[in-house]
Curated annotation (Swiss-Prot):
Name this protein carries in UniProt: Glutathione S-transferase P
Domain annotation GST C-terminal: ranges: 83-204
Sites bearing N6-succinyllysine, chain numbering: K103, K116
Gene behind the chain: GSTP1
Highest taxon of source: Eukaryota
Positions of modified residues (Phosphothreonine): T62
The UniProt record lists the keyword Acetylation: yes
Quaternary assembly: Homodimer. Interacts with CDK5.
Length: 210
């Protein structure tokens, strides 16, 4: 039986980064898909610590909060930098990813039609810090922190992939980020996952907007 279980809605949402991570690390996991109808009944929601999904099970450990789950996997699988300095940088970058993801979620679920143009115009300013970070690490030819992959690489990759759907060409003026996405997406296990029905057929968001 797979050691990990993801309990979530039938979307990529906040779980696709951890799925990409698990796939790339050769880990197996089980999906328990929760429909909106089931969720609205309230019985599952009442058992969730913060009243929200995802819920993640690692053996007898149950976790909520997607970034806590990513950090747990980072520690468990050696994806948290090679020392405390790198771990601090990984945390910093992950907070930056979360900031932009929250902006994206607000756009998708509350003001997509009226807010998309302004969001896309402001997007370069939000992407620039990640380009800068890459430029400061081995000329952008490695990972976002250090010389080995960390959990934040998977989170950033997912964030960039969904923004390429929202705003095709958004990385055209960011050559390091563009190469970074191509490089990570070409890793054999990530490439296989991104081309699999599990990824391709799963909507990005729950309301059909992307």
């Amino acid at each position: 039986m797979p050691p990990y279980t993801i309990v979530y809605f039938p979307v990529r949402g906040r779980c696709e980064a951890m799925r990409i991570l698990l796939a790339d690390q050769g880990q197996s996991w089980k999906e328990e898909v929760v429909t909106v109808e089931t969720w609205r009944k309230g019985s599952l929601k009442s058992t969730c610590l913060y009243g929200q999904l995802p819920k993640f099970e690692d053996g007898d450990l149950t976790l909520y909060q997607s970034n806590a789950i990513l950090r747990h996997l980072g520690r468990s699988l050696g994806l948290y930098g090679k020392d405390q300095r790198e771990a601090a940088l990984v945390d910093m970058v992950n907070d930056g990813v979360e900031d932009l993801r929250c902006k994206y979620i607000t756009l998708i679920y509350t003001k997509y039609e009226e807010g998309k143009d302004d969001y896309v115009k402001a997007l370069p300013g939000h992407l620039k810090p990640f380009e800068t970070l890459l430029s400061q690490n081995q000329g952008g030819k490695a990972f976002i922190v250090g010389d080995q992959i960390s959990f934040v690489d998977y989170n950033l990759l997912d964030l960039l992939l969904i923004h390429q759907v929202l705003a095709p060409g958004c990385l055209d003026n960011f050559p390091l980020l563009s190469a970074y996405v191509a490089r990570l997406s070409a890793r054999p296990k990530i490439k296989a996952f991104l081309s699999s029905p599990d990824h391709v057929n799963r909507p990005i968001n729950g309301n059909g907007k992307q």
